[in-house]
Amino acid sequence: MRGAWCSIFLAIVVLPGVSMAGDFQVTSPTIKDKATISNEHVFNGFGCSGNNASPELRWERAPKGTKSFAVTVYDPDAPTGSGWWHWVIFNIPPDTTTLTAGAGKPDGGGAPAGSIQSMTDFGQPGYGGPCPPKGNKPHRYIFTVFALKVDQLPLQKDASGAMVGFYLNQNAIAKASFTGKYGR
């Protein structure tokens, strides 16, 4: 028992700069964690006929030292061997705590000033909703907000999701996620 307490003490002393998992949170009023994503947010194309509107996202309790945010939507179940990037937006100002519904329009009109929406695996910037192949089991769509230790990532709007993901993981102080599901 004494060894367990020593381990806990060392973790607290050695990891003071790491945000605990329960601190930073992201939610959406229209997509609940582990629930089915509505047609409002489904892609319009590739055989899907949704409204392709990005959901409102809200986050709270970002860690001290956050200098910017980024948001990604990623489908790890896409039959590509490498998943599918549905939305990548970064350089979101540090005082932002909400992305309004529709902020992911490809023209960037609803996104926070100064932010960049880069390429998705649909071949365009902005939000691209769920549209898994017919007959697949429902896919998981992971909505993640990253709290970053840098003001800006040194990337442009033509950066791939994988490239942005690399920079996000190199500069994240904390991240918060929830998962929606969709199948057809």
Identify the role of each PLM range.
Residues M1-W5:
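Positively charged n-region of N-terminal signal peptides that target proteins for export
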Residues S7-G17:
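Bacterial N-terminal signal peptides
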Residues S19-R184:
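N-terminus-centered regions that define maturation/targeting leaders and the start
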